[in-house]
Amino acid sequence: MEYISTRNSSKTFNFKEVFIKGLADDGGLFIPKSLNKFSEAEIDSFKKLSYQDLAKNIIFSFIGDFMSENDLSRIIDKSYSVFREKNVVKLIKVGDRSVLELFHGPTLAFKDVAMQLLGNFYEYYLNNENEKINIVVATSGDTGAAAIDAIKGKKNVNIFVLHPHNRVSSVQRKLMTTGKEQNVINIAINGNFDDCQNLVKSMFADKIFSNEIRMSGVNSINWARIIAQSVYYFYSYFLVEDKDRPLNFSVPTGNFGDVYAGYLAKKMGLPINKLVVATNQNDILHRAISKGSYEVEKVTETISPSMDIQIASNFERLIYDLNDCDDAKTINAMKDIREKGKYIIDQERLNKINTDFLSSKMSEEEVLETIKKVHEK
């Protein structure tokens, strides 16, 4: 499979380049040049597969030039052997709804599902290429902990984690800062997550620096994270017994990565009806999807710090789609966000968004009340 940047559709890359670079040199995000869509028969054949075997089928279609099918199979089995749940994730009923449990990995974060795989991808790559890599990652808490657990102790790779000082939970801080592995370096930044993320982006943008240190990234902009997360949309879809009604996925999201993985699954042929973007008070995605106003505001601290984000990096991939895969229009949109702090989505493009996405926003009080209500069911 060939890949392109959202800001330059004329230059192609293979998966190895996409994975190691993380971010394109032009600042854009990597996407497939063309996407293979599974047939109904193929999707039907996936129904009885274990999570691990399903992952092998889906992920190999994206990375075939990176490793053999046997190597991928071995790495997937190794990656998910550290999960407490045999099938990696678990679907439970809560009233008339189903909830997908994604917390069975080593750091209790949904990001373990992709991050454990990425850690072993790096190990495979470095063993074959005889190189050294420096991973730089921004985190609001759970990404850093999951990335550290996946990378710690591995040879020829260091991981530098930038987190906002006093803006991560106590558990997240301890998970990130109490290890003794020599290849893990934590840096607390005075600011919020967006400040950390902007520092990482600026390092990637400095081509001389990033090439000199062999810099790589594991934030949700890394395409490998997206394809790994798309697997559990397929798996959970097959577990839902009542499919007489259209199936919607409601996804808490800050950086638009996890819900974009659901969008990718839909584009691959999974019959998802709507993807509901659930936000806290930092509601830039809700405003974009419901009103067409992607306007950056001040970050509000909440009890869900992983969603305390005002610049949702993965939204650029959707902007590219909305503009009919026009890289020049995507560049202009990202320039508006960077220079004016906003991007206005016209009604035609908003209608396109709403064929796939809905959104909602909740206050702190509503979040706490909902947690209590669900817990008591």
Q: Where is each model-derived feature located?
A:
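PLP-dependent amino-acid enzyme catalytic core
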Residues: 1-377
